[in-house]
Structures are given as structure tokens and as C-alpha cells.
A protein has these predicted regions:
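Conserved ABC ATPase signature
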Residues: 134-138, 142
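A short, proline-enriched helix->beta-strand linker immediately N-terminal to the Walker B motif
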Residues: 153-157
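Catalytic Walker B motif of ABC-type/P-loop ATPase nucleotide-binding domains
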Residues: 159-162
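Helix-to-loop junction immediately C-terminal to a conserved catalytic motif
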Residues: 48
């Protein structure tokens, strides 16, 4: 279980997180939504221990990660897999080398074991037989799948998805959403998805948390979010700007 308690973080004059409280249960799929620049990625960095809070706690299985030494923090991070918005593949490496990048550097795995685990990961994301291809040979959706294969090769307990459908057309986005659901069910992992895509939210989410003005504004099911009458929630999920806002 992951528990965030009264988390606060300021950058200069901007209070990005202002008392975030959030509990993420083992095995659930939580979608985090909110305005651009509203602190979703900052919250994610705190959960994985990449950013230190000004105050508050992030508890992973009961341990406050802000007070762990580097070795203990590394052990916690091994529980996590991450699919980045851009897939973050190395263009000069093959698909196999990308997926096995960290695994190969541990030097306690045989080449045969690494090859087997890469093949298993690719099969799980429905991309068998592409080990020798370079990222430039892949479409955007295929790159996302390879990025997910890299995230799951460690067999993590928690997978983070940062805008997994950004830059993809609706058909490919739908296939990625369905893949996320299948991977979650097959691996029985906790999944945390950051997205602005309301179709994706409805497809993958079991519970949704909305971050607004530095705090968790509300939580609920995707259906509850789409049916919300609260103007802050309603405008966001329908993509309607406030009349007081001006876009330039």
C-alpha cells in the first residue's frame, strides 16, 4: 500500500503540493487527473522518491521513504516500474537492449536468462519477435509497448503510467488502454495512471483522484467523475474552460 500524508512542496513562490492526502491500495488501478502544471508529475516523483517533500510523508508498505538511506530507497524503487510519456527509449539500442538495459548491468543474470525475460515481456505486451529492431523502426504505439515491456521486466509491484496515450491516435490509444488493463490483471499489480485523456480514464480506471490547487480535490469512480455536478470537476472532464480564464 502507498499512503501520502499532508504532502507539501514549494518551488520558489509556487506552492505546487499543498497538503496532499491519498491512499493507494494494493492491486488497484488509480487514475490521477488534473490541470497541466497542477503537480501530478511532482506527486509522482515524491512517490518514487525522486523528490524530497518540504513536509509530509510518503509511506510505501508502511515505510516513510523520505527518511530511507540510498540503499534502502533503491530497494523500494525496485518495486516500481515506469512507462514514461515519450517511452524514453535509447535510439541507438535495439529493442532487446532497451528492455534489458538495467538488468544487463546488474551482472548477476546470464545472457540466456535476460533473453528469456525480454521475450516474456514482449509477449506480454503483444510485441513478439521485435528484439533486433531499433526504436526508429517502430510506430508510436509500438514504442509505448516496448516502454511498458521495459517497465515490467523487473516484475514490479507497482506500475506508473505518465500520460500513456499522449501523441497517439484514438484507435492506438484504445489499444494501449486495453493493454494496460490486461497487464494489470495478468501481473496483479498496482497501477497509477496520470492522464488528461478522459476516454483513457474511463477505460482503465477503477478509482480516480483529481488534483486541484495542490490538493486532492475529490475521488470517485470514472462514472462518478463524468456525472459530477461540481463545476471544477465537470468543466475539467468535459474540457470546458472557466469563463474567467483567457487563453493566449
Amino acid at each position: 500500500m502507498i499512503e501520502v500524508r499532508q504532502l507539501r512542496k514549494r518551488f520558489g513562490d509556487q506552492q505546487v503540493l499543498d497538503g496532499v492526502d491519498l491512499t493507494i491500495e494494493k492491486g488497484e488501478t488509480l487514475v490521477i487527473i488534473g490541470r497541466s502544471g497542477g503537480g501530478k508529475s511532482v506527486l509522482l516523483k515524491h512517490i518514487v522518491g525522486l523528490t524530497h517533500p518540504d513536509s509530509g510523508q510518503v509511506l510505501v508498505d508502511g515505510r516513510d521513504i523520505a527518511h530511507l538511506n540510498e540503499r534502502a530507497l533503491l530497494a523500494v524503487r525496485r518495486k516500481f516500474g515506469m512507462l514514461f510519456q515519450s517511452a524514453a527509449l535509447f535510439d541507438s539500442l535495439t529493442v532487446e537492449e532497451n528492455i534489458a538495459f538495467v538488468l544487463a548491468r546488474e551482472r548477476n543474470h546470464t545472457a540466456e536468462e535476460i533473453a528469456r525475460r525480454v521475450a516474456e515481456a514482449l509477449e506480454m505486451v503483444e510485441m513478439p519477435g521485435v528484439q533486433k529492431k531499433k526504436p526508429a523502426e517502430l510506430s508510436g504505439g509500438m514504442r509505448k509497448r516496448v516502454g511498458l515491456a521495459r517497465a515490467i521486466i523487473y516484475r514490479p509491484e507497482v506500475i506508473f503510467y505518465d500520460e500513456p496515450t499522449t501523441g497517439l491516435d484514438p484507435v492506438v490509444s484504445d489499444s494501449i488502454d486495453k493493454l494496460i488493463v490486461r497487464v494489470c490483471e495478468r501481473l496483479e499489480v498496482t497501477s497509477i495512471v496520470i492522464t488528461h485523456d478522459m476516454r483513457s480514464m474511463q477505460a482503465v480506471g477503477r478509482r480516480v483522484a483529481m488534483l486541484h490547487e495542490g490538493r486532492i480535490y475529490t475521488t470517485g469512480t470514472p462514472q462518478e467523475m463524468m456525472a459530477a455536478t461540481d463545476p471544477v470537476v465537470s468543466r475539467f472532464v468535459r474540457g470546458i474552460s472557466d469563463e474567467k480564464e483567457h487563453a493566449f
